Amino acid sequence: MPGLHVVSFLVVLLLQLRSSGMHLVASELFWGNTLPNGDIYVGSFDGLVPHGPGKYMWTDGALYDGEWDKSKMTGRGLIQWPSGASYEGDFRGGFIDGAGTFKGVDGSVYKGSWRMNKKHGMGTMVYSNSDTYEGFWNEGLPDEFGKYTWADGNVYIGRWKSGKMNGSGVMQWINGDTLDCNWLNGLAHGKGYCKYASGACYIGTWDRGLKDGHGTFYQPGSKIPCNLEVSDCLTSHDGTSASSSSNEKITIGLLFLLQKLCKNWRLRRFLHRPRRISNGTTPVFDDNSGSHLCQDVSSKSFSADDQCLQDSEVDKDSVYEREYVQGVLIMEQPKNEDSRMSESGIAQENNWEKQAKGPMETIYKGHRSYYLMLNLQLGIRYTVGKITPVPLREVRSNDFGPRARIKMYFPCEGSQYTPPHYSVDFFWKDYCPMVFRNLREMFHIDAADYMMSICGGDSLKELSSPGKSGSIFYLSQDERFVIKTLRKTELKIGLMKYVLQILLKMLPKYYNHVKAYDNTLITKFFGVHRITLKPGRKVRFVVMGNMFCTELRIHRKYDLKGSTQGRSTKKQNINENTTLKDLDLSYVFHVDKPWREALFRQIALDCMFLESQSIIDYSMLLGIHFRAPNHLKRITSCQNALESTGISAETECSVALHHEETISSKGFLLVAADEPGPAVRGSHIRGSMVRAAEGGYEEVDLVLPGTGRFRVQLGVNMPARARKVQEDVNVEVENRDTIEEYDVVLYLGIIDILQEYNVSKRVEHAVKSLKFDPLSISAVDPNLYSRRFISFLEKVFPEQD
């Protein structure tokens, strides 16, 4: 049995223990004798090592009093530091590990779980400024799910990542305003719903904490979709919080479980309306700040159905369509009552939380595309891993032929060449692997990055609205690549050839064209694959570069062909994710003269190539990022204040903007590319930089104040001036100062290049020509198509005066 005894020479033992990696080790002295290094240990030993209860004091004044196991602190104990900080709780293997309470020098207190000296698991932190966080921790930071309460009464409850609000969550301010939104790095980012204390509300999109894009504003008394109402029954009749008076309590851990189990379960029903007013704050996680988190919240449920107004009670002018750019209101108009009261309009508003996912949803286990995604990832990982070790060389004619294929069978249990997997058995075919390997190299796409982007630990995202053809689109998690399925609905009628075969037929000339012209705007293809399932079902995929892979928000998207027949979108079908068409375009874009010349020079070359392949139906995909003029940002706070009172910004903010001439209205700056500072380069872009007249015909970078610095290349990060086209010519001439103009950043490229002008298209042209103007329909001769296409774009990008 271990016993108490005195050891007069423990220097060797002390050094051995410390050399084992322990910074808290012990030797024993009895009756106050001191070790040669000045430390003191009094306690129980097992042989020559501390074991059992004991107390160790360091020369700097730190003290541990607790249990030991084979020279390591293990079990319950108390440690006090000279600074005044202390910890009491569980230890394991010499580390703070388990449940315990830490008290900081600044008065902050953490009570909860630990792992390896870091907060990990469930715990509550009361910071020195009286802020509190209650929830889950990971590696010392709030993570996963929790509730943060500021000292002034503001509350956030929802998801966290690495100490910041990240994911779905609800923020409620002390004045009663509530924001139910997605969050990113501590800022509102994504689709959200804001309910003001006045009764007004706004449904729209936030970008890095600012309203951005289209939304709907409801004044007090207007009809609000029923499932958006926050019930007043959360506040009792005497004005106190129902959550504080309820006998039923629910912990943060159970809230987390409920949210995971119930996708439509709303956190905001657990937030009550406070009574006093205070400004909002943003949490900062360090030793000197934090949040006051309630130990529990009310589980009292409610129904908001009885609060919805009848249609007859609604003023048609009490609902407004709005558009914001970086928090600045640039458009407001009464919402069209027909679209608002239509079945599709009501369904769209009532399903705002489904829209919150954006135009895509992450593929999860149980999703209809889950096994297809696993098969695709397994196949790409196998192919890229097989082709990458082969020395890079120029492609040969046989690299395009029918034998240029990689085939493999993937059984669930695995084989000599394939790993076991959790999907279904399938056959894999990869087309022209050496050609696409060279194309990826051409665009500086590293093989490892390519696999991680598509086949990494994260799932792919499926676009919620497939195209007319029935194809389904997937995005890699980093959104660098688009994966499109090629279905039988895209067969060439009569010839019965898949679009895939069209691509493979034109691949040799496509390869030469892309190699010859660095700045080509044509779609970049990086792989073609086929999956065959056991019943014989075949799914073909093509991997392409994503034109809109940018951290900037794309406010408008247009698909421009140059034809007019059927080239408009019904207003009731338009939302912020809609890709608009030719007749919907109400802007022209002025770009720098050298950029315009380079742009149309490349468009002409690309159209010449497509014409040589008898390709039609291609289009220019145009993405627009609007920049808010600096002088308009100064009235943002005014607009936000008006919203909280439910007053229309169109009514109250109709005053003229008188700003100093010294304040620039530019939403961006151009700087020389050789100036110091990192610039973000477009994904899978290899073309040379374009030269700007404004920059003295030198290569330039685009600087967006408050956002970053971007490399300007043809079709990527291109700054321009957008001018709204006025229908009334006289207004345009006489009131040029009132013309709407915006600084914009453009992204563009030519897509849908896999439709030949074949027999079916000739028949389509003949039939439609009987009813419509032959020049207005899309199906025309390739030569006419390319000339009409370029002519239309010249009007979209006119020469500057």
Swiss-Prot record:
Q: What induces it?
A: By auxin, abscisic acid, cytokinins, gibberellic acid, Ca(2+), methyl jasmonate and salicylic acid.
What is the tissue specificity?
A: Expressed in young seedlings, shoot and seeds, and at lower level in roots, stem and leaf.
Q: What class of enzyme is it?
A: transferase
Reported EC number(s) for this entry are: 2.7.1.68
Q: Which GO terms describe its molecular function?
A: 1-phosphatidylinositol-4-phosphate 5-kinase activity; ATP binding
MORN repeat residue numbers: 41-63, 64-86, 87-109, 110-132, 133-155, 156-178, 182-201, 202-223
Listed SMART domains? MORN, PIPKc
A Gene Ontology biological process in which this protein takes part is: cell differentiation
Q: Which Pfam families match?
A: MORN, PIP5K
What are the entry keywords? Answer: ATP-binding, Developmental protein, Differentiation, Flowering, Kinase, Nucleotide-binding, Repeat, Signal, Transferase
List, for all copies, the residue spans of the domain called PIPK.
Answer: 366-797
Known catalytic reactions:
a 1,2-diacyl-sn-glycero-3-phospho-(1D-myo-inositol 4-phosphate) + ATP = a 1,2-diacyl-sn-glycero-3-phospho-(1D-myo-inositol-4,5-bisphosphate) + ADP + H(+)
Where does the signal sequence lie?
A: 1-21
Its cellular-component GO annotations read:
plasma membrane
Instruction: Share any extra remarks.
Output: Transgenic plants suppressing PIPK1 show earlier heading (7 to 14 days earlier), delayed leaf development (a common phenotype observed with earlier flowering), and greater expression of floral induction genes.
**Described purpose of this protein according to its UniProt entry:** Involved in flowering. May suppress floral initiation by modifying the expression of genes related to floral induction.
PANTHER family noted in UniProt: PHOSPHATIDYLINOSITOL 4-PHOSPHATE 5-KINASE 8, PHOSPHATIDYLINOSITOL-4-PHOSPHATE 5-KINASE
Protein name in UniProt: Phosphatidylinositol 4-phosphate 5-kinase 1
Tell me what organism the protein belongs to: Oryza sativa subsp. japonica
